[in-house]
Amino acid sequence: MPSIDINCDMGESFGPWVMGQDTELMPHITAANIACGFHAGDPDVMLATVRAAIAADVAIGAHPGLPDLQGFGRRVMAVTPDEVYALTVYQVGALQAIARSQGGRLHHVKTHGALYTLTARDPALADAVARAVADVDPALPIYVANAAIAQATRERGLRAVYEVYADRSYQDDGTLTPRSQPHAMIEDVDQAIAQVKRMVKEGVVRALSGKDVPITADTLCIHGDQPGAALFARRIRAALEAEGIEIRTV
């Protein structure tokens, strides 16, 4: 039976400011990528999100980002491999400690925003993240795009969990269409469902050019900060289960 994990970025509120639809989304996912205080989140939010994930039997993931609260971690910064190593160890270690304090355990790591982009294309920064995760806990998989970070993850002896998106279009090389370009986002739920079905069952995705591109789909990312995200997640999960696709943590 084909299967897929469903992950969502969570815990991205900060103080009284609320981001995302965490409560509504939690029942529809199998893994939560929890912000660790650098691009979003704070200790109280991290703790509350970990508790909610444990209560819902959702896997707990660390979601480290660049130190950029104002830019939500989406602005590219000039960072060195040593800086990326340090900020990754710091954030992953913090969430790991919170999870343990509540009787849970850290399940995976997924980088956020600009750090995700940088590690997809820069082998040195990708290796810095992989080395940091391996040094914290070599049993932790990393959720990756099929890019530099995937190779670095494998070379460090870690498991690479390949991530796909329902609401993003793809290019001929298997990369996501940049958000700055037309048709980068897929807003029609039926189109998104059809795309995910093919990725899971056939291992291909239809690029914007019309070309079918090979793709590995281990985990599906749902964007929790989009309007109607909870309904979107519920409909996608129901459609996949109706196709005989098992929804489970990797």
Swiss-Prot record:
Give the Enzyme Commission number. Answer: 3.5.2.9
Ordered alphabetically, the record's keywords are: ATP-binding, Hydrolase, Nucleotide-binding
Which residues, if any, are the signal sequence?
none
Enzyme class, UniProt record, top EC level: hydrolase
Pfam families (UniProt xref): LamB_YcsF
The molecular function GO annotations come to: 5-oxoprolinase (ATP-hydrolyzing) activity; ATP binding
Catalysed transformations (reactions): 5-oxo-L-proline + ATP + 2 H2O = L-glutamate + ADP + phosphate + H(+)
Q: What PANTHER family would the database entry show? A: 5-OXOPROLINASE SUBUNIT A (PTHR30292:SF0), UNCHARACTERIZED PROTEIN YBGL-RELATED (PTHR30292)
The entry assigns this protein to a family as follows: Belongs to the LamB/PxpA family.
Among HAMAP family, the record links this protein to:
PxpA (MF_00691)
Q: What is this protein called?
A: 5-oxoprolinase subunit A 2
Species for this entry? Bordetella bronchiseptica (strain ATCC BAA-588 / NCTC 13252 / RB50) (Alcaligenes bronchisepticus)
Q: What is this organism's lineage?
A: Bacteria, Pseudomonadati, Pseudomonadota, Betaproteobacteria, Burkholderiales
